[in-house]
Swiss-Prot record:
ATP binds at G10, P11, E12, G13, A14, G15, K16, S17. This is Thymidylate kinase. It catalyses: dTMP + ATP = dTDP + ADP. It holds the Pfam family Thymidylate_kin. Its EC number is 2.7.4.9. It comes from Pseudomonas syringae pv. tomato (strain ATCC BAA-871 / DC3000). Keywords: ATP-binding, Kinase, Nucleotide biosynthesis, Nucleotide-binding, Transferase.
Length: 210
């Protein structure tokens, strides 16, 4: 059985991790084998790269350095976690994947689509998510939620224009490839967001059955 690769995307404060865990519980209740993971991270080495990417520092990080670190972590994550799980026939639920790179390093940092796409092909080959859930909400709501969590990481400290570009990139990618993306209104209450996920569950189960 071939596995199913589902990614959850969205800006800061969109509730991706919480809703990833909820979706996993719903799938497991139907007898589905689910693996939860995240990017950057997912393996001990990739988590160390995550720390480099997120920790505020007195030394600035160039956009190219950031991009290469993201894909270095992704290469390790794919080799050690994602590809083996898919080969076992599991459903992989991943908090962020390459759409986040296009949104943050492309939209936010201004790196070209072509540069990101070249690394995407090099690291991933033909592997792409089967389905991507984009948790969308206004920037000001997301930043307010992120601030309420406490100390901000290096990305969360960016300004409004950065996150406007991140959001626009996500929405444009979803519009360009509607077969792969599902938009979820993350500005709703948690109960309403999870009700939206419940409505998606039959589609996910059908995809998993092939």
């Amino acid at each position: 059985m071939t596995g199913l690769f589902i990614t959850l995307e969205g800006p800061e404060g969109a509730g991706k991790s919480t809703n990833r865990d909820y979706l996993a519980a719903q799938l497991r209740a139907q007898g589905v084998q689910v693996l939860l993971t995240r990017e950057p991270g997912g393996t001990p080495l990739a988590e160390r790269i995550r720390e480099l990417l997120l920790a505020p520092s007195d030394e600035g990080m160039s956009a190219d350095t950031e991009l290469l670190l993201v894909f270095a972590a992704r290469a390790q994550h794919l080799a050690e976690v994602i590809r083996p799980a898919l080969a076992r026939g599991e459903v992989v639920l991943c908090d962020r994947f390459t759409d986040a790179t296009y949104a943050y390093q492309g939209g936010g940092r201004g790196l070209s689509h072509e540069r990101i796409a070249a690394l995407e092909q090099f690291v991933q080959g033909d592997l792409r998510p089967d389905l991507t859930l984009v948790f969308d909400l206004p920037v000001e709501i997301g930043l307010s939620r992120a601030a309420a969590r406490g100390r901000l990481d290096r990305f969360e400290q960016e300004g409004r224009a950065f996150f406007d570009a991140v959001r626009s990139t996500y929405l444009n990618r979803a519009k360009a490839e509607p077969a792969r993306y599902r938009l979820v209104d993350a500005a709703q209450s948690l109960a309403d967001v999870q009700a939206s996920l419940d409505k998606l569950l039959p589609e996910l189960l059908e995809l998993q059955r092939g």
